A protein has these predicted regions:
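Activity-critical C-terminal alpha-helical subdomain
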Residues: 340-346, 353, 440-490
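C-terminal segment of N-terminal export signals and the immediately downstream linker at the start
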Residues: 4, 24-67
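Glycine-rich N-terminal segment of FAD-binding domains in flavoprotein oxidoreductases
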Residues: 32, 43, 64-165, 179, ...
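Substrate-recognition/cap regions that form aromatic- and gly/pro-loop-enriched pockets
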Residues: 347-452
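Short glycine/threonine-rich loop-to-helix capping motif typified by GTGT followed
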Residues: 286-290, 335-345, 392-405, 457-468
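C-terminal substrate-binding/cap subdomain adjacent to the FAD-binding core in PCMH-type
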Residues: 3-22, 29-35, 196-366, 381
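Short loop/turn motifs at secondary-structure junctions and domain boundaries
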Residues: 160, 188-192
């Protein structure tokens, strides 16, 4: 363990790139840097396999995210060369009471992974995957591995994780910290429900292996725990047989309630392996175009899809059915060309004041209709409105909160606003708060990957019966409260 430096003591044993850190001032709660940018041997910090960065470009990048709304500037960014680096630096930050946040792909929209005056740990270098064999039932991966890479590595052996988010270029550690929802949840639960073990660095700098049967309190406090009790550095994921091809259906509906009812029927009956839906604006700007997306997996995981059996009894417009077969990975990665086009058009730099709500099935149509009636195409911009039907009994992770009803819906309004239009961003943030309150009034909550202003009291309400266990785990595993302050929970 590194010794505590004196008030203006030099820090030894670390090579820092960019602006060189020459000392930490506990009274001022800051690290001093030289302007020379030369690499310098410093005192007190542990030696690292990776690098610590305090240059302007690194700090500016870490003070931004996909939302481009919140900006909290750290004093340093760690690019670890090993898990040992994460352990050592978290231990040092705990000694000095410096806040710490891990950052995967920077896809958070509201400053969740930012940290003012502290240390950001980039997890992308921790991206090992495997080994995987033909008969494997699990795979162990680094927290910085992207789901696209995990899919490719496992598909080489005819295997796949059972649940994916629609966008594959997210880090494993990032989605496991929030939940990991997609169109397969009604069959397999969330991504967090398909984890068999973790390696975690606690807020005290302890490296811990945990699972449902070993240090289970930490295991359950970290999955969907928003980084409050530990930093995931490695996860063991469940694997299932992968289909070779899938059949993708798109069904059109005239009204919201029928659209949601048919989603409910499909997940209750388990006809499809993937169910999702979109709502878009009609020619007059009203959000009345409803498209249900459903996917049936083919051999070797299931029989060849039978169109008549799969679509029987549904109330879509039969004249507008679109279906097609495609390779499984192409289906998983179907957003890739859209993302590439968005980046080329500059949309990736837009502000993203996202609304993500968990709505109880009995109130989903009423609450979402009110929100959609107030939404304009200009508010949504080049974004999208999504519905995912969820079955309560498949969601077993305590900190992944949803309604108590059998069927809930994840309702997403994923707006994209030109970055200089701060008035619209502020207005949408206010609207997001109002929408959350409407959801909470009927037993819903947020899925915490969006941009909803939240207080500490809101978080206690959000976690509900799970709050005492989370609070206890926070005291045990992050007693000085240094981890992920950007969530605003404690």
């Amino acid at each position: 363990m590194s010794r505590t430096p004196s008030r203006r003591g030099l820090l030894r044993g670390l090579t820092v790139t960019g602006a060189a850190v020459i000392g930490f001032d506990p009274a001022a709660r800051s690290w001093a840097v030289t302007a020379s940018g030369s690499a310098t041997e410093l005192a007190g910090l542990p030696r690292l396999d990776g690098t610590l960065h305090a240059d302007h470009a690194s700090l500016t990048a870490a003070a931004d995210d996909y939302g481009h709304i919140v900006h909290h500037r750290p004093v340093a960014v760690l690019r670890p060369g090993s898990v040992r680096d994460v352990v050592s630096m978290v231990r040092f930050c705990n000694e000095q009471r410096l806040p710490v946040a891990p950052r995967g792909q920077g896809h958070a929209p509201f400053g969740q992974a930012q940290v003012e005056g502290g240390l950001v740990i980039e997890t992308a270098p921790l991206a090992d995957i495997g080994p995987v064999g033909k008969g494997s039932t699990t795979v162990t991966v680094g927290a910085g591995a992207r789901w696209s890479a995990v899919a490719k590595a496992t598909l080489a052996h005819g295997l796949t994780p059972p649940v994916f988010t629609d966008y594959l270029e997210l880090s494993v550690g990032g989605t496991l910290s929030v939940g990991g929802l997609g169109g397969q949840v009604h069959r397999h639960g969330a991504q967090v429900d398909n984890v068999t073990a973790l390696r975690v660095v606690t807020g005290a700098g302890e490296l811990v292996r945990c699972s449902p049967s070993r240090r289970s309190d930490l295991f359950h406090a970290v999955l969907a725990g928003l980084g409050q009790c530990g930093i995931i550095v490695e996860a063991t994921l469940r694997l299932v047989r992968a289909p070779e091809t899938v059949r993708h259906y798109r069904l059109s509906y005239d009204d919201l309630e029928t659209f949601l009812d048919d989603q409910r029927v499909l997940v209750r009956e388990g006809r499809f392996d993937y169910v999702e839906g979109q709502v878009s604006a009609d020619a007059g700007g009203a959000f009345r175009v409803h498209t249900l997306e459903a996917v049936a997996y083919g051999p070797p995981t299931g029989p060849a899809p039978d169109d008549a059996a799969l679509l029987r009894g549904l109330r879509h417009d039969p004249s507008t059915v679109h279906s097609g077969d495609l390779p499984y990975y192409d289906f998983l990665d179907r957003l890739a060309p859209l993302v590439a086009a968005d980046k080329e058009a500059g949309v990736w730099t837009y502000a993203h004041p996202w609304l993500n709500l968990m709505l109880p099935g009995s109130s989903a149509a009423t609450v979402s209709a009110r929100i959609l009636n107030a939404l304009t195409p200009a508010d949504l911009g080049p974004g999208v409105v999504l519905f995912y039907p969820l079955l309560r009994d498949r969601l077993t992770t305590p900190l992944l909160r949803t309604s108590d009803e059998e069927v809930s819906y994840l309702f997403d309004v994923l707006s994209a606003v030109p970055p200089d239009d701060t008035a619209t961003v502020d207005r949408l943030l206010t609207a997001n708060r109002s929408a959350y309150e409407a959801a909470a009034a009927v037993g819903g909550t947020q899925y915490p990957v969006g941009s909803i202003p939240f207080t500490r009291a809101d978080w206690r309400t959000h976690f509900g019966a799970a709050w005492p266990r989370l609070k206890s785990a926070k005291r045990t595993y992050d007693p000085r409260g240094i981890l992920v302050p950007g969530q605003g929970i404690f």
